[in-house]
């Protein structure tokens, strides 16, 4: 049997989401894209128009889109559509400029963020730069309310600004594990309705992980101002009052020759005590996430000109201040030949061909970025960063009869990530020769003490403090990631050091939730296994305050029913309707199995990976804590877990049995209390909702106070 999965009809939900999110329509709602293929034609035409010979490239671009290349939602929605919606961007990911510790700059960055969200982009911020609650503000002659109170302003702004194309605004807030207000940050979202427009992540350092392992004390610190040091007569060599640390604040502070900032010690506590506060919150509330920030910066290709402190809202793009990145994913299920048979195989030549063409397509998106801020446009034009990843890994493994989490699945994940990376960097060199390298490659950088501290091998190569070195040399020869690429193809990286690459970054694995469900017919999200093979998914519908629950099937189940057994269903009791044992779901995989898959991909992904390790509700807390240490030891750049806990929040993907077994209480205005099962329908404010989704919308503040 040689099954053609291209011909499996799209399920109704997939078509509905394409229609509501990606289909181009006139201002009165009349469809302009007549079909999904016409959406592909629009995108291919817009990207080919950036070439010297558009007609030459239109056909290959359209072929790639028909064969597994899926640009991210902003590109699919907006490329070729600027005549109809001129204020929208093709860029999914941005990070705010550094928020300086002044009222003027805090409110200025709110304004910039509002414009960014209005253009349809997600945005991340580092709030570690704001002095802690209770610190004295000499200019105001008063004490500050701290970063959390200012985060509330950003939250309300995001809630108010309707993000373009009917999307809810997406924000990431990060805080350094050394910040004095870190515990307040960890626990902030326990208050109903607070910071609901944010994902929250901690910037976890290697020093903190070591302190936890060694049961050592941990200092909470924040920079002194230069004025404080002078007025209070603080000795710069007094370890009791001052420590030197890498910190993003660079204005009005004291900096040493290594680029470190003089910081005040606010409090010292056992590292394990702080660790337990984090773990308790993550176990019960699935937040904050972890960003292993030292690993992010060590492996950053632009290590010589960037200090990364924040990510986009889903965490797959760590970016510098004003950084921006566009995304795209390759649907791996497209390349499975003879699925579900002993002859099942992955078509590597076809995969490499799609990746090569798609790399050129994504590079062209830089020319039509439509970012709202000049500094964002300067960043993306100078570095030409993009993040190509894949989706459908779990579905693909099932079609190849490989269990997700097994040794074979880890090996396949590493191979597919390496093939994607190597093809991308080969294309980077070809494009640089044809069109020129990214401008930053030809820029000269003065060697600083910090650069020599971070890369001692530069001194061994005879490079001295104050020397001028081109970006292409610092990128290819001294980036830790590019040296991994050199282990496979040293000639390629040597030539990149001579010519410069077309872009500084090529790969990133996004969650792909909506494009997987729509354009990939519910192939598994990103690097994930399928959540379940038949389940309810909570989707945002324009104009509705609660999410709407829709019934969906996994792509691999649809394919199996189409190609092998039309009667097959999960949990079937009849022998003739059962699925093979390699049909597994997120709950069947151990937390360490999730981490192993992520680690296999991370070696070859030059940005980061958005991934969630699903944890059973009854998973022991002591074992849960070990997942994060295991993730750190495995070389990950970030880690997120999800444990079903309906009292705290409602996930995007929900199993029917979980809803049936969960009760929700609602108190009416007259004091009457009603109880409803999670899947029961309730009419409220003129709309029908499931009890679970209504409870979640009320809790998040979409109807005012909870």
Please identify what each model-predicted range represents.
Residues 1-90, 238-262, 275-279, 629, ...:
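Acidic/polar, glycine-rich intrinsically disordered N-terminal extensions of enzymes
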Residues 324-388, 398, 572-578:
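Long, charged, mostly alpha-helical binding arms that flank functional sites
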Residues 4-8, 91-348, 371-375, 379, ...:
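Active-site cavity-forming subdomains of large catalytic enzyme subunits
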Residues 14, 316-318, 362-367, 437, ...:
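Catalytic alpha/beta core of large soluble enzyme barrels
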């Amino acid at each position: 049997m040689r099954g053609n999965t291209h011909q499996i009809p799209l399920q109704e939900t997939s078509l509905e989401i394409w229609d509501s999110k990606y289909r181009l329509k006139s201002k009165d709602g009349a469809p302009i894209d007549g079909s999904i293929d016409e959406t592909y034609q629009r995108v291919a035409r817009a990207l080919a128009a950036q070439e010297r010979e558009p007609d030459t490239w239109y056909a290959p671009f359209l072929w790639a889109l028909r064969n597994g290349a899926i640009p991210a939602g902003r590109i699919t929605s907006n490329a070729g559509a600027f005549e109809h919606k001129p204020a929208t961007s093709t860029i999914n990911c941005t990070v705010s400029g550094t928020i300086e510790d002044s009222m003027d700059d805090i409110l200025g960055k709110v304004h910039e963020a509002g414009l960014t969200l209005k253009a349809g982009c997600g945005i991340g911020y580092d709030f570690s730069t704001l002095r802690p609650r209770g610190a004295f503000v000499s200019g105001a002659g008063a004490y500050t309310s701290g970063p959390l109170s200012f985060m509330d302003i950003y939250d309300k702004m995001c809630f108010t600004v309707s993000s373009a194309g009917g999307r809810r605004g997406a924000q990431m807030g990060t805080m350094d594990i050394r910040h004095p207000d870190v515990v307040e940050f960890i626990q902030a979202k326990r208050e109903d309705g607070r910071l609901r427009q944010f994902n929250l992540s901690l910037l976890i350092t290697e020093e903190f992980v070591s302190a936890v392992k060694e049961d050592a004390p941990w200092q909470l610190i924040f920079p002194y101002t230069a004025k404080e040091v002078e007025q209070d007569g603080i000795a710069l060599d007094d370890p009791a009052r001052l420590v030197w640390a890498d910190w993003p604040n660079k204005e009005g502070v004291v900096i040493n020759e290594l680029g470190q900032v003089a910081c005040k010690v606010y409090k010292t506590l056992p590292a394990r005590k702080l660790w337990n506060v984090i773990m308790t919150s993550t176990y019960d509330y699935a937040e904050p996430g972890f960003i292993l920030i030292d690993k992010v910066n060590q492996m950053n290709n632009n290590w010589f000109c960037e200090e990364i402190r924040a990510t986009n809202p889903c965490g797959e793009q760590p970016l510098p201040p004003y950084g921006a990145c566009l995304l795209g994913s390759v649907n791996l299920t497209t390349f499975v030949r003879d699925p579900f048979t002993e002859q099942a195989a992955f078509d590597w030549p076809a995969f490499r061909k799609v990746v090569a063409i798609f790399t050129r397509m994504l590079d062209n998106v830089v020319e039509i970025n439509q970012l709202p801020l000049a500094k964002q446009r300067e960043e993306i034009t100078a570095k030409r960063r993009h993040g190509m990843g894949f989706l459908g890994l779990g579905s693909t493994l099932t079609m190849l009869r490989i269990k997700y989490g097994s040794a074979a699945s880890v090996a396949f994940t590493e191979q597919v990530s390496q093939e994607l990376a190597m093809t991308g960097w080969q294309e980077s060199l070809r494009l640089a020769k044809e069109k020129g390298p990214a401008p930053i490659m030809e820029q000269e950088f003065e060697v600083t003490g910090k650069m020599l501290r971070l890369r001692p091998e530069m001194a061994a190569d005879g490079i001295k403090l104050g020397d001028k070195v081109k970006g292409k040399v610092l990128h290819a020869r001294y980036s830790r990631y590019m040296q991994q690429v050199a282990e496979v193809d040293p000639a390629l990286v040597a030539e990149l050091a001579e010519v410069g690459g077309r872009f500084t970054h090529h790969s990133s694995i996004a969650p792909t939730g909506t494009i997987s469900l729509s354009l990939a017919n519910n192939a598994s999200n990103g690097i994930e296994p399928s959540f379940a093979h038949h389940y309810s998914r909570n989707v945002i519908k324009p104009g509705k305050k609660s999410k709407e629950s829709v019934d969906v099937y996994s792509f691999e189940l649809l394919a199996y029913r189409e190609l092998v057994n039309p009667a097959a269903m999960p949990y079937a009791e009849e022998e003739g309707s059962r699925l093979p044992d390699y049909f597994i779901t997120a709950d069947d995989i151990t937390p360490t199995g999730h981490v192993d898959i992520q680690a296999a991909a991370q070696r070859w992904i030059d940005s980061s990976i958005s991934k969630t390790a699903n944890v059973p509700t009854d998973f022991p807390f002591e074992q849960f804590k070990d997942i994060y240490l295991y993730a750190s030891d495995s070389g990950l750049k970030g880690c997120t877990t999800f444990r079903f806990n309906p009292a705290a929040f409602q996930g995007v993907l929900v199993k029917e049995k979980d809803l049936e077994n969960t009760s929700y209480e609602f108190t009416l205005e007259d004091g009457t209390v009603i109880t409803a099962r999670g899947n029961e329908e309730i009419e409220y404010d003129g709309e029908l909702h499931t009890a679970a989704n209504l409870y979640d919308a009320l809790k998040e503040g979409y109807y005012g106070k909870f």
